[in-house]
């Protein structure tokens, strides 16, 4: 039936029942049907008519299909759904875990190569573990890995509480952290200090990632 929306009250009415903001509904992404409450779900599979069409495509296509994946879980799902490899693994996405981002921020705030390498060495086990798990899921399929690409300002603390936590851990002032964060800000980050430029300025980052990649494969 038709859905009657009331944006002011943040509610809609369907099939004689009114749903309010926060109520749980379930939507079938294939049919578009809406169901009341939370219904049991299953993982998507390549089956039925869709599966048959995909079999036809596989029979005649010449173009290989790879996917973006940055975690072992995403890699496993990609292979399950027929990907022939990983077209792009964006390693910067591997660092946003709370413990990882904290050590990465310490590296960014460090003023010497030795200090940067000290904190980067703490990240190697995480990188190595992720790559090893992804290799296992790929079972010999190819993977293109992109080293840390974004400008470093994307990793810096955003709140005063985060800045204070970082300052306390490194034995520096909050003002020092704020100064570094301000200095890292870029007007046009898409064309700025990123990618290969970042690797030229801080080769120790690329060395850490290269080591993790190779050791995971051994």
Segments (PLM) and residue ranges:
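Short beta->alpha connector loops at strand-helix junctions that form conserved
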Residues: 1-2, 89
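A structural-propensity feature for long, helix-poor, extended segments
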Residues: 2-36, 112-114, 119
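Surface loops and adjacent helix of pleckstrin homology
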Residues: 30, 37-39, 148, 157
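Short, compositionally biased
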Residues: 35-53
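Conserved alpha/beta-domain cores
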Residues: 46-49, 56-218
